[in-house]
A protein has these predicted regions:
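Divalent-metal coordination cores built from histidine and acidic residues
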Residues: 73-78, 82-83, 87, 93-203, ...
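Acidic, glycine-enriched loop/beta-strand segments at the rims
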Residues: 36-48, 407-415, 419-420, 468-478, ...
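C-terminal cap of metal-dependent C-N hydrolases
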Residues: 34, 333, 422-428, 434, ...
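Divalent metal-binding pocket/active-site signature
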Residues: 195-253
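Active-site neighborhoods of metal-dependent hydrolases
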Residues: 148-151, 156-159, 163-183, 187-210, ...
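Bacterial N-terminal signal peptides
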Residues: 3-18
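Histidine-rich, glycine-flanked metal-binding segment
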Residues: 23-27, 36-81, 96, 514
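Divalent metal-coordination and catalytic microenvironments
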Residues: 34, 49, 54, 75, ...
Length: 577
């Protein structure tokens, strides 16, 4: 009887041990048998990936040990999470923290650029709330870092990083008027850039075709970019011109990088307007020449032949001097209206970048309105609205701005598909949607985004990799992950390596692609099955979990981390080649 009892006790102990082992597997997630593209650009391998906490724990063939969650990735591609190098989810993530349009494409890091959500003066906060569109929210922060803190506290699925806007800093000190800073004001602007860098900015950013940013001269930008470089950051910029004065605009970016010591990224690399499509070779040669001289220049792009912005890009900068309210007031004056109308009809102005001139009324598609009475015009071209209102397209554009009380969201069809196919293959090119991160429900259905909001990255993989063979999958993954991560000096992100953050995408390379169109833009992409962000599921079996997996990803001068703080010069930092 004693022997039986002892045997029973031993058996019970073994069973209990097995149950404990089953309850506490060594890993949180194991991804098994996938074709792994590690983000470095090297050839893929078939291995398992184990995740523990927010980090990758192990990568090897046939890993022993189970995960609390197991993903069978046989026949699937596994890669680092994609980096949206130019994103505008500033407001959309406040309304819905999932960012589903990008999440469904495998984006795990949204990088805010062109402007920033801080630092703000009380007047800037007031105007920001006054100018809000469909999404209403209180502006509760004032500092650059305060906005990132707010997002983290609210809860978001994607990681979010941000540059500090040169235009934001300019408005902080100078307002929205066409004025130049005094030496004391410029020093104060530099101080705001330094403060933002130490609060986590990745660098300095600008959009030089828009007012009031366009009022800044090159020396001002060099002075601000120098602070970014001293703080380990880069300079990202929508160039001052993308059509007739493209060469001069690219040269300005090169000059700023060379003089400041800050690496520069050219936003949405393009040649706008049919007459400029032949300039691609010259533009590429300028970048390659600068890089050969060890001036660090890179670029990013979206994968569509139309851009999306506002009707402010169709009108001269002088009429916009002082901000939106003064712009609208000037448009109501008959003399100003006539002058604007005449200047809009000049496709080759010398002092501003006329996107309307490159697209024409038929190539200007209306996407987003603030005024509910104008929303039925969504999806129509400017030419169609002009016909309905029985006036010229230029007058229609002016009236739209006045009636809507906003810049009005539009798409401009200006680029060449042949050029785009060459651009995606450039080795120094990464990718950005230049859009918000909406979700196809609720308030987001009140307007039409550009389809790139839902399709930019899936289109790269489906159309330009699988269908056209313009670049290989391993190269595309590298330039969605490891390449931009290195350019941004991100620590522990962009590659699949033990010890790195577990931002991981599992997708089907045979089916991944976009579904969004200009007429039906609110359609999520297909082919991405699972997305881990910081080791937790943000997308599982194609469905958003709603989990708050995201964090603020801050630059290397952030004083909240060991070794933070700005340096005496750019030479005190290590830079990506």
């Amino acid at each position: 009887m004693r022997g039986l009892a002892t045997g029973f006790a031993i058996t019970l102990a073994v069973v209990s041990a097995d149950r404990v082992g089953a309850a506490t597997p060594p890993y949180d997630v194991v991804i098994r048998g996938g074709t792994v593209y590690d983000g470095s650009g090297s050839a893929p391998t078939i291995v398992d990936i184990a995740v523990k906490g927010d980090r990758i724990s192990a990568i090897a063939p046939h890993l022993p040990g189970r995960g609390a969650a197991e993903i069978d990735a046989h026949g699937r591609a596994v890669s680092p999470g994609f980096i949206n190098m130019l994103a505008h989810p500033e407001v959309s993530l406040i309304a819905d923290g999932r960012g589903l349009s990008d999440l469904a494409q495998g984006v795990t890091l949204e990088v805010i650029g062109e402007d920033s959500m801080g630092p703000l003066t009380p007047e800037m906060r007031r105007l920001k709330e006054q100018r809000e569109g469909d999404i209403k929210f209180p502006v509760t922060w004032t500092s650059f870092g305060g906005y990132l803190d707010m997002l983290e506290k609210k809860g978001i699925s994607p990681n979010v990083a941000s540059f500090v806007g040169a235009g934001t800093v300019r408005v902080n000190l100078l307002g929205e008027s066409d004025v130049q800073p005094t030496s004391q004001q410029l020093k104060a602007m530099q101080g705001l850039v330094r403060q933002a860098m130490e609060e986590g900015a990745l660098g300095l950013t600008d959009a030089l075709i828009y007012s009031p940013n366009t009022y800044a001269k090159t020396p001002e930008l060099i002075a601000l970019a120098k602070i970014s470089a001293e703080c380990g950051g880069i300079f990202t910029v929508h160039p001052r011109n993308e059509d007739d004065r493209l060469k001069e605009a690219i040269q300005e970016v090169v000059d700023i990088a060379q003089a400041s010591g800050a690496p520069a990224e050219i936003y949405h690399f393009k040649q706008a307007g049919h007459s400029n499509w032949g300039k691609l070779d010259e533009e590429i040669a300028m970048v390659n020449s600068a890089r050969a001289k060890r001036v660090r220049i890179t670029a990013d792009m979206y994968t569509y032949t139309s851009g999306a912005t506002g009707l402010d890009a169709a009108m001269p900068s002088w009429v916009q001097d002082g901000g939106l309210e003064k712009w609208i007031a000037r448009l109501k004056d008959p003399a100003n209206r006539a002058k604007v109308r005449t200047e809009m009809r000049d496709p080759h102005p010398k002092t501003w970048d006329n996107l309307y001139g490159g697209a024409g009324a038929q190539g200007t598609l209306l996407l987003a309105f603030k005024n509910p009475e104008l929303k039925p015009l969504t999806g129509k071209t400017l030419a169609e609205v002009a016909k309905i209102w029985k006036e010229s397209p230029e007058d229609a554009a002016i009236d739209l701005v006045i009636k809507d009380g906003s810049r009005v969201g539009v798409a401009y069809f200006m680029m060449s598909e042949a050029n785009l196919r060459r651009e995606v293959a450039l080795p120094w090119m990464s990718f950005g949607s230049d859009q918000a991160a909406p979700t196809p429900e609720g308030v987001f259905l009140l307007s039409h985004p550009h389809p790139r909001a839902y399709g930019n990255f899936a289109r790269l993989l489906g159309t330009y990799v699988r269908q056209n063979h313009d670049l290989t999958l391993q190269d595309a993954v590298h330039r969605l992950t490891g390449f931009p991560a290195a350019n941004l000096s991100l620590k522990g992100r962009g590659l699949l390596k033990p010890g790195y953050y577990a931002d991981i995408v599992v997708f089907n390379p045979d089916t991944v692609g976009e579904r969004a169109t200009y007429t039906e833009p609110h359609q999520v992409a297909v082919g991405v099955e699972d997305v881990l962000i910081n080791g937790a599921f943000a997308l599982k079996e194609g469905k958003a979990t709603g989990a708050h997996t995201g964090r603020a990803v801050r630059g290397r001068a952030w004083t909240g981390a060991p070794g933070g703080g700005c340096r005496a010069s750019a030479a005190d930092w290590t830079w990506s080649k």
